[in-house]
């Protein structure tokens, strides 16, 4: 959370990401923060708070990182799912992780079984952030978010399951921050 706040404040005018297949063209750190904070508020509005698990099923796209940070930077736990996972693997990961919400790209929505779709509190289409399914249209409350501590779980990454069912690897905020620091120190700066 502190790294997110630092980067989106200090580098607010710099380009965060760029792509060439849409009119938008990319995000600055400031526009990334705006989208991420707005999406986090949507999750909070539907009662998705700190410690709740949020699955992300998508191919690589700019909005993937928006969904990840709207989840992890506010105390929720991100559950990324590989886009080449089968429908059965997607079902197993969502069931095992006890995810309440799923972000899914248009391209991969067919991998979400009717059973899983019915069980989700919230299903959000990742390409546009439109709500595809909500458990109760009238359900709104202030889900409690929190500033995560270094020991809090940030994400659970599931293996590809080449030797059986996928296994979850738990990574804390400290793990992710350590990776960023290592990358920073390994790059030559001029």
Language-model features and meaning:
Residues 1-16, 34:
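A short N-terminal helical cap/helix-turn-helix that marks the beginning
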Residues 12-15, 139-158, 165, 188-190:
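Conserved pre-ATP/AMP-binding loop-to-beta segment of ANL
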Residues 83-112, 179-190:
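Conserved ATP-dependent adenylate/AMP-binding module captured primarily in the ANL superfamily
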Residues 54, 71, 102, 153, ...:
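Conserved S/T- and glycine-rich ATP-binding loop of Class I adenylate-forming
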